[in-house]
Amino acid sequence: MSSFIDITNVISSHVEANLPAVSAENVQSLANGAGIAYLGKYIGTGITMLAAGAVGLMQGFSTANAVQAVARNPEAQPKILSTMIVGLALAEAVAIYALIVSILIIFVA
């Protein structure tokens, strides 16, 4: 539990350090609606990267279940391993697509 809290503190301090300072120009752009687009861009990127986090979680579950299956039936290890690697590669493709979409949202939109 403490490692999760440490990770959250590191992330929040990194976000706070990289946020632009509030100035009169930033407040005026918020009033003009440009700030809402700016905010929406980063919220959309965060939502997109939730897919990458979910992929990481599911890859962990997949690997754990494959290890349990091999422990129960060591003779089936080659088939289980090959099936697991194909499944992990397909899942990793989703995470890569999410990363590409996030980069496009940040730099193109």
From Swiss-Prot:
InterPro entries: ATP_synth_F0_csu, ATP_synth_F0_csu_DDCD_BS, ATP_synth_F0_csu_sf, ATPase_proteolipid_c-like_dom, F/V-ATP_Csub_sf. It is found in: Cell membrane. SUPFAM superfamilies: F1F0 ATP synthase subunit C. The keyword Transport applies. The chain crosses the membrane at residues 42-62, 88-108. Keywords: ATP synthesis, Cell membrane, CF(0), Hydrogen ion transport, Ion transport, Lipid-binding, Membrane, Transmembrane, Transmembrane helix, Transport. It is a multi-pass membrane protein. GO terms for molecular function: lipid binding; proton-transporting ATP synthase activity, rotational mechanism. GO terms for cellular component: plasma membrane; proton-transporting ATP synthase complex; proton-transporting two-sector ATPase complex, proton-transporting domain. It holds the Pfam family ATP-synt_C. Its main location: membrane. The record marks 92 as: Reversibly protonated during proton transport. F-type ATPases have 2 components, F(1) - the catalytic core - and F(0) - the membrane proton channel. F(1) has five subunits: alpha(3), beta(3), gamma(1), delta(1), epsilon(1). F(0) has three main subunits: a(1), b(2) and c(10-14). The alpha and beta chains form an alternating ring which encloses part of the gamma chain. F(1) is attached to F(0) by a central stalk formed by the gamma and epsilon chains, while a peripheral stalk is formed by the delta and b chains. F(1)F(0) ATP synthase produces ATP from ADP in the presence of a proton or sodium gradient. F-type ATPases consist of two structural domains, F(1) containing the extramembraneous catalytic core and F(0) containing the membrane proton channel, linked together by a central stalk and a peripheral stalk. During catalysis, ATP synthesis in the catalytic domain of F(1) is coupled via a rotary mechanism of the central stalk subunits to proton translocation. Belongs to the ATPase C chain family. PANTHER family: ATP SYNTHASE LIPID-BINDING PROTEIN, MITOCHONDRIAL, ATPASE PROTEIN 9. This is ATP synthase subunit c. It comes from Ureaplasma urealyticum serovar 10 (strain ATCC 33699 / Western). The lineage of its organism: Bacteria, Bacillati, Mycoplasmatota, Mycoplasmoidales, Mycoplasmoidaceae.
